[in-house]
């Protein structure tokens, strides 16, 4: 899969209907956006949030897609784009006193990660974007 914004090759992975709320998953995704895949996986390994496990799986899957489908070097991969969309909401009821029932919304997420292969110059996409904005 080629990205029209950059000349660098990209690979994508998506996890749909993950049983974690989008707000909590976005906190985890914000930790790793713009970092190398190796750094991102190390950060997520020790992150205390429950959403770090599915996000790490998606990043590892995107890296595997880049390595197997596009023959890219895993050491040059950077998490270029990562975002979380809201999935379907499972609606459940919590019984309450006197015949009442409260609704429980079990939210799901769609986690998307796009990894990009950068030349071995050592600059990350985060540094490049900051320089171009000025």
Curated annotation (Swiss-Prot):
Q: Which residues form the signal peptide?
A: none
Keywords, A to Z? Ribonucleoprotein, Ribosomal protein, RNA-binding, rRNA-binding
One of this protein's GO BP terms?
Answer: translation
Query: Which NCBIfam families does this entry report, sorted A to Z?
Result: rplV_bact
Under the heading CDD domains, the entry gives:
Ribosomal_L22
A GO cellular component annotated for this chain's UniProt record is:
cytosolic large ribosomal subunit
Function of this protein?
A: This protein binds specifically to 23S rRNA; its binding is stimulated by other ribosomal proteins, e.g. L4, L17, and L20. It is important during the early stages of 50S assembly. It makes multiple contacts with different domains of the 23S rRNA in the assembled 50S subunit and ribosome. The globular domain of the protein is located near the polypeptide exit tunnel on the outside of the subunit, while an extended beta-hairpin is found that lines the wall of the exit tunnel in the center of the 70S ribosome.
| Membrane-crossing segments per the record | none
Q: Under the GO molecular function aspect, what terms does this record hold?
A: rRNA binding; structural constituent of ribosome
Under the heading Pfam families, the entry gives: Ribosomal_L22 (PF00237)
What family is this? Belongs to the universal ribosomal protein uL22 family.
| Quaternary organization | Part of the 50S ribosomal subunit.
- Whichever gene encodes this chain, its name is rplV
InterPro entries in UniProt: Ribosomal_uL22 (IPR001063), Ribosomal_uL22_bac/chlpt-type (IPR005727), Ribosomal_uL22_bac/org-type (IPR047867), Ribosomal_uL22_CS (IPR018260), Ribosomal_uL22_sf (IPR036394)
Q: What is this protein called?
A: Large ribosomal subunit protein uL22
Q: What is the lineage of its organism?
A: Bacteria, Bacillati, Actinomycetota, Actinomycetes, Mycobacteriales
């Amino acid at each position: 899969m080629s990205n029209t914004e950059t000349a660098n090759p990209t690979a994508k992975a998506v996890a749909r209907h993950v049983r974690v709320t989008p707000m909590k998953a976005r906190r985890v995704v914000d930790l790793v956006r713009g970092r190398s895949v190796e750094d991102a996986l190390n950060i997520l390994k020790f992150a205390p949030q429950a959403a770090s496990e599915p996000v790490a799986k998606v990043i590892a899957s995107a890296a595997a897609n880049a390595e197997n489908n596009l023959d890219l070097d895993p050491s040059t991969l950077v998490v270029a784009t990562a975002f979380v969309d809201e999935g379907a909401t499972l609606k459940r009821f919590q019984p309450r006193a006197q015949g009442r029932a409260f609704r429980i919304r079990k939210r799901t997420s769609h986690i998307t990660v796009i990894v990009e292969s950068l030349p071995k110059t050592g600059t990350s996409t985060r540094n490049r974007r900051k320089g171009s904005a000025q």
